[in-house]
């Protein structure tokens, strides 16, 4: 699939001296202790995929416009000190910072900056305008409990949330796609989540979210955090933001947090099924139990060959 991320290289960026990663088209798990840079790695890869909506809206985007868009994206994702790009340059490094990503369709984006730079300098954008598959980033904290009014507040005020939270709220507020256009595995996953939660989350627009059972309706805030987290995945499938074989990579930071054992097992089953049907998934975790569920539930032949573990 041309939407998949194949290769990432980070040099003198944040805490990375020279990091090179090759990605599986299916499941990728980044493993490491707190503070090893897992979230930074996810955000860097996600940020380099940010050209997709830009080129969709303006196919003839110039280098200057692309540099401005990517710079703004990185600043909002990483929120460096004083909102300065140069603060993301690796401390004490003498060479420029370098970020590059290569995709399965041959598209590439590479950019550099120094510790005094105000904007990224694009060095290579080979066929990058052809990469138009939008990606999804699910942050560690669930967002259903504070979605109402969040997007307008985020645009108006300097909230202490990085842009992954605004991005996910915007995707969750999209209307659902027609049922007949949903992937069969998406329908299956949504039904499984509804079954284990005992109901479903309903999105009314404007960030208003409730939880409905057969006989009653409740505030989303009254539901367990693990259920809200599962509800986010279900909604992303319902809106088509995650569409196996069509959408770009799914980045998920610590998907296991606040999940009970039954929910964690179901989550792994769903992620494996989505990956088998063309969805690239890139996770970050330090949880042994999550890794064990992948080990127990994956197909020992096919899944093992296409699942990649990277420790940081």
Each PLM stretch: what is its role?
Residues 1-54, 210-308:
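Switch/communication elements of ASCE P-loop NTPase nucleotide-binding domains
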């Amino acid at each position: 699939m041309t939407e998949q991320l194949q290769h990432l290289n980070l040099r003198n960026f944040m805490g990375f001296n020279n990091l090179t990663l090759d990605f599986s088209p299916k499941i990728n798990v980044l493993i490491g202790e707190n503070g090893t840079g897992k979230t930074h790695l996810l955000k860097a890869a996600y940020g380099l995929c940010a050209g997709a909506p830009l080129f969709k809206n303006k196919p003839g985007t110039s280098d200057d416009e692309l540099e401005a868009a990517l710079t703004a994206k990185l600043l909002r994702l990483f929120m460096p000190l004083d909102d300065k790009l140069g603060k993301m340059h690796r401390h004490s490094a003498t060479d420029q910072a370098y970020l590059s990503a290569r995709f399965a369709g041959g598209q590439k984006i590479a950019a550099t900056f120094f510790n005094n730079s105000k904007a990224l300098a694009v060095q290579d954008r080979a066929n990058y305008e052809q990469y138009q598959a939008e990606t999804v980033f699910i942050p560690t904290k669930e967002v259903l409990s504070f979605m109402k009014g969040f997007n307008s507040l985020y645009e108006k005020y300097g909230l202490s949330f990085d842009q992954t939270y605004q991005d996910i709220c915007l995707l969750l507020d999209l209307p659902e796609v027609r049922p007949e256009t949903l992937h069969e595995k998406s329908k299956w996953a949504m039904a499984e989540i509804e079954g284990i939660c005992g109901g479903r989350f309903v999105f009314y627009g404007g960030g208003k979210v409730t939880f409905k059972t057969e006989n009653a309706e409740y505030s989303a805030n009254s539901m367990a955090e693990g259920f809200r987290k599962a509800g986010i995945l279900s909604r992303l499938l319902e809106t088509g933001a995650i569409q196996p074989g069509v959408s770009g990579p799914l980045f998920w930071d610590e998907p296991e947090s606040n999940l009970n054992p039954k929910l964690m097992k179901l989550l792994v089953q769903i992620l494996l099924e989505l990956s088998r049907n063309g969805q690239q998934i890139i996770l970050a975790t330090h949880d042994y139990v999550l890794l064990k569920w992948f080990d127990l539930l994956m197909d020992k032949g096919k899944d093992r060959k296409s699942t990649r573990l990277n420790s940081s």
